[in-house]
Amino acid sequence: MDTIKFTLKEDAQGNKNPILPEGVKNYLIDIDGTVGEDIPNEEPERMATAEVFPDALAQVNKWYDEGHVIYFFTSRTEAHREVTEQWLKKHGFKYHGIIFGKPRGGNYHGIDNHIVKATRYKGKFTDFVLKEATVEVFND
């Protein structure tokens, strides 16, 4: 795994915050049902043999090779760390880390003091295209 290169930017209060270089994205990518077969936590014995989605593997590795930050963000638990890391390695995924314990059930709505973008996976990974959409924001 490559080291992530940040610059420190000072805010109005004098605090230094890590900032990615221009054009570099932080990807948070689900595992089950997104880069491979959808396996529920209740069936961990299937995780080691889950089918990989080849287009997802190619796109994730392309983003990594382009210098983007790749983290898998999964509802799997820490108890699934070993089988998850082995599966990712077996299939050749390039990534910087894994965050376990994502809330289950879907219907996610991210709130952050940084720009947040989300892309719903609908069965195939491709390059992104621009599309106009309505988004929910806080009332100014």
List each model region and its residues.
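HAD-like aspartate-dependent phosphatase fold
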Residues: 1-140
